[in-house]
Amino acid sequence: MADDVGLNDLSCYGGDHTPTPNIDALASTGMRFEYSFSATVCGPSRCQLLTGRYPFRTGMNSNKTDTMPLAGTEIMLPSVLKQAGYATACVGKWGQVSWDNRPAPPWGFDESCAFLLSGKYWSAKYYNNNTEKNLANVEYMPDVMHTFLVDFITRKQTQPFFLFYSLVHVHDTMFRTPDSNPATKSINGSAEFYADNIRYMDKLVGQVVSTLNSLNLRNNTVILFVSDNGSTAHYKGIPDTIRGQLIDGWKNTMKEGGARVPLIVNWPGVTPAGTVNHDLTDFSDFLPTLAELGGASLPQGVTLDGTSFAPQIKGQKGNPREWVFVERNGDSYARDSRYKLGNDGLMYDLKNAPFEQILVAATSTDPEMILRRQRLQKILDDHPAMAKTQ
């Protein structure tokens, strides 16, 4: 899982600025999803992905720490997969539920090498299997996390494993990477270092694939690459464009660019190579999808919001969801394959204007518009956004 990487940041989605050859290779030999939706900020997105439940159910509707679910109150994806015999590990950023007992049980991770919050690159604190450590002056957090990842995969290569790899990149503040040109005079946070961080993230993705290949695990391993929310490139003065078209919205907005994120799935010999899937998915779908792929039973006695897209990963039609729901700190919207309705009453026709250029008048007398609005409003009524937290 990348941090703050939007569609515009990846060349396989038409991003105009920095080539991402390793991520592109996953897409060209796997499946790229066009309409995958997160929450608009990291904490709610990650909590939704790991629990299969919308923010109004878990309480995690913002990045406020007092909204984080407490240990033991939610069943998370690693716990589900452990019951099917999987070794589990969390590597990288931890910012979706409380840090009680670190990512160890009851959240379901056997092992962890993680840091709190975001944007930790140099001179920071982290936890290796719950032991607090500090980076040495020359250590780069992404490399430390990656070294742990390679060690875990190597040790667990003879058994099924689930690895939640939460990359540091490309959350602010953008620092120079070990690969940055030493002669670059730009200050931290600059557009030049943004591109460097995109490239370094892409390099790490390529190294994961190389590790799996070297251990002869690649054909038996499903890789899912996704981001936790939309991009922040515009804060650096970098236009959020795809093939020259400006995306409407970015991280922490309810516009299309805030929650529509990259999703690439690659499973050699199973996922049809080079395919583009136009089904709707949202982050509640990951738990049932990975449970199905891993032969695990879904938790009982809990409401799950997700729909498995495991059949689509295998090249089958499956049972695509008809709508997605996105919530952020009192705001929400429901979106189907063509229309989007927010709890502010604004409705958009996205068919020929994918970034919300066409507003559907609330007073429209078109029977189709009335029916579509009613259907989407019913979804919003059935999924009440939590009140805004201060």
At which residue positions do the language-model features occur?
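Formylglycine-dependent sulfatase
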Residues: 1-343, 350, 354-388
